[in-house]
Amino acid sequence: MRRSTSNGAVVVPATQDGLFHDSPFPIPDSRLIAGVDEAGRGPLAGPVAVAAVVFDPGKPRINGLDDSKQLTAERREQLYARIVDRALAWSVVLIDSEEIDRINIYQATMLGMRRAVEGVAHVAGFARIDGNRVPKGLPCPAEALIGGDALDRAIMAASIVAKVTRDRLMHELHTRHPEYRFDQHKGYSTPVHLAALQTHGPCPQHRRSFAPVRLALQGREGLEPDPGTRDLEQLQVGQLVAPL
């Protein structure tokens, strides 16, 4: 079934399918490999995005692909347009902050990967996933590739699709919650974002299971953090400064 939006910037809860972009080829081919990657695992706000891309061997090779984190926003947008035009099939799934809080970020990422692969399984006979874990319940054989977003072209493409989709959404969320400046940091734990959290408290897009958000919420409610978790929470703040 074809499911799409005009701009791709829609939060898709984990209980729903992702955004599926079909091709005219209905039979999976074991020679066609889906590259899978995520964006937004570490931010304090917004969804985690997972994309899967299967290249069309009959279309020209896309030059300039790389890990999305190594590209400028302008370059990512340019490559995104080429990827979705030349891909045999692609899908992107967004798991929202509420679902992340309910099942945790690791499980949300695994679920997003499974749904993204499901979106291209009518074409791809194999999935190659960035990282060191293969989600359970995939519709085709798969392997994990550590550092795959710098090694495999399909994974590079998936990282770009996931990143661009998520960044577009964060710009949209900025118009709803301008006080947090989601357009600048995309939900990551920057000084500007942390200061806004302290001033305004969390909005519905914040991940309350993440320590800095939980601390801000507790502070506004006049609650003391659990003393045994202070060191862990400080460690998590440091880990979340850089995009994952």
From Swiss-Prot:
Domain of life, per lineage: Bacteria
Assigned keywords, A-Z: Cytoplasm, Endonuclease, Hydrolase, Manganese, Metal-binding, Nuclease
GO cellular component: cytoplasm; ribonuclease H2 complex
Reactions this protein catalyses: Endonucleolytic cleavage to 5'-phosphomonoester
GO molecular function: manganese ion binding; RNA binding; RNA-DNA hybrid ribonuclease activity
UniProt: a divalent metal cation binding residues: D37, E38, D130
Cellular compartments annotated: Cytoplasm
Record-annotated RNase H type-2 domain positions: 31-222
Cofactor detail note: Manganese or magnesium. Binds 1 divalent metal ion per monomer in the absence of substrate. May bind a second metal ion after substrate binding.
Family membership noted in the UniProt record: Belongs to the RNase HII family.
Known function: Endonuclease that specifically degrades the RNA of RNA-DNA hybrids.
Protein name: Ribonuclease HII
